Amino acid sequence: MKKITILALIMSLFASAFAIASEVNIFNARHYKADGELYAKFTNKTGIKVNLINGKSGALEKRIIEEGADSSADLYITADAGRCGAMDAKGTLQGGLTSAAIKSAVPASFRTSKWVGIAKRARIIYYSPERVTGAELSGMTYEGLADPKWKGRLVIRKSSNIYNKSLVASLIKNNGKAATAAWAE
């Protein structure tokens, strides 16, 4: 519910910016029913029509970059802060997300002046109870996955996957580059 509250807050803050427009274009890479319900509430509250342009993150990002200043996107909503950071690094995001309401609702580690996190996702570890005991996983951390006992027993997404890049970025922030490099070996 907090995710929806924060997204509603962000949408309401944009309402004044969209006040001169009768509609807003949201490039949307998320696929959650609750988001659609929120957009409907936004339209009911403001009278501003929400046009959803749904697609995969990569395709939407490519379109935004190719269209540049002529992009029809008013908001881009995606599923990982790593994607926001990459878009920011390419210079495609505008600033201005500095309101007191955003600052009070969203911790500094989940926002910049160009993007705001609206949800957190747990990175969980699945296991086969036929091959791994609960005792083996007691106190498990991502760092613990580097233990040699797990060699040949793990399956993860490709290292180029944005979720893995974000995981590695969080490990670097928490443990430093050297420790994370050793972990990744």
Identify the meaning behind each predicted range:
Residues 17-21:
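Boundary at the C-terminal end of the N-terminal hydrophobic targeting segment
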Residues 1-6:
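Positively charged n-region of N-terminal signal peptides that target proteins for export
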Residues 22-86:
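Early extracytoplasmic/lumenal segment of secretory-pathway proteins
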Residues 7-16:
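Bacterial N-terminal signal peptides
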Residues 29, 33, 72-185:
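Extracytoplasmic ligand-binding site segments that recognize negatively charged/polar headgroups
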Residues 10, 65, 134:
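Generic anion/oxyanion-binding catalytic loop in active/binding sites
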